[in-house]
Design a protein with these regions (language model features):
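A structural detector for beta-sheet-dominated domains
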Residues: 5, 22, 33, 38-40, ...
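Short alpha-helical segments and helix-capping/turn motifs at coil-helix boundaries
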Residues: 16-19, 55, 77-78, 162-163, ...
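Single conserved hydrophobic/aromatic residue that forms the stacking wall/gate
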Residues: 2-12, 285-286
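Extracellular beta-strand-rich solenoid/capping regions of secreted or surface-exposed proteins
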Residues: 13-30, 49-65, 84
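Catalytic domains of carbohydrate-active enzymes that cleave complex glycans
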Residues: 156-163, 174-284
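Right-handed parallel beta-helix
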Residues: 28-39, 66-77, 88-101, 110-141, ...
Length: 287
């Protein structure tokens, strides 16, 4: 090969695939703490009804940040709590979302190594599939999760709503750990347009998820061949318990110990303990 023989293999690859190195303008060590954001989200939320229902009250967004954090923050009646966008090594934890339910909670959007932990979402509003019923603790339509090419996100000890599910908003997020979380497991709440599928690439892992509803869809599929929407590469699910569900295991890498909790109770904490020799005190505080 002409390029390889001259030590120019990397140059060839960049030319062939369009790779390039760019500067990344960003801020470091930005912290948001001890504040409450209050919006006026409607009390009759309907997904994609109009701009006001979907996004009228987005009080804050963390964009192009590294080594930054949000903690001890409350959101009341917001359309969307916080998107962590085009960022790296950002944490958001000890957060409460209350009031009227809205569109989204907290997401890693096109970011790397984002930690979202101990978020409690108890917003109220009409059930998505039965708008005549007002559900206390229904939760944001999209619970905490990922969007765009997010990589290496951890969703840890989050307690989301009864009429919700984790977000996985397509455009190819990958390597997401949903660890020791509790809430509804409502299908088709992940989001994403059909031309942005799949919802998630490889390495989606659900560990010790505690479902607060029984899932009637039988079997529960991860790749819908009859629709342009709803497409996950085979996930790993370990210790799914609480409500009943029948997974199509042919669409999964692993479904282990369904109906039981497993040890370690938190995969993220176990990895921290192995890597650091101890677990930070944060994880000892239970929601």
């Amino acid at each position: 090969d002409y390029y390889a023989s001259r030590g120019l293999g990397d140059v060839y690859k960049r030319q062939r695939w369009g790779w390039a190195i760019h500067k990344y303008p960003h801020y470091e060590e930005v912290g948001i703490e001890d504040v409450t954001f209050v919006g006026h989200a409607t009390d009759d939320f309907q997904h994609h009804r109009n701009w006001a229902h979907d996004g009228a009250y987005k009080p804050i967004k963390m964009t192009r940040l590294t080594n930054s954090w949000m903690r001890r923050v409350n959101f009341i009646s917001v359309s969307e709590a916080n998107s962590i966008t085009s960022s790296a090594n950002v944490s958001a934890y000890d957060i409460k979302i209350d009031g009227n339910r809205g569109h989204a909670a907290i997401r890693s959007q096109g970011s790397s190594r984002v930690f979202i932990g101990k978020v409690t979402d108890r917003t109220n509003g009409p059930l998505i599939d039965n708008r005549g019923v007002i559900q206390q603790g229904a939760g944001q339509y999209h619970a905490c999760g990922v969007s765009k090419p997010s990589m290496g996100a951890v969703i840890w000890r989050v307690h989301w709503g009864l009429d919700a599910c984790f977000e996985s908003h397509a455009t190819q997020p990958r390597a997401t750990l949903i660890d020791n979380c509790t809430g509804g497991f409502m299908q088709y709440r992940q989001g994403g347009d059909y031309n942005q599928m799949p919802n998630h690439l490889a390495d989606l892992t659900l560990w010790n998820f505690n479902a607060k509803n029984n899932v009637a869809d039988s079997p529960f599929i991860w790749w819908d061949n009859n629709s342009l929407w709803w497409k996950f590469l085979p996930p790993i699910v370990v210790g799914y318990h609480g409500g009943s569900i029948h997974f199509d295991e042919s669409q999964m890498k692993l479904n282990e110990e369904q109906g039981n909790t497993v040890t370690p109770y938190s995969l993220y904490e176990a990895q921290l303990r192995k890597r650091l020799g101890a677990v930070p005190a944060l994880s000892l505080i239970h929601i």
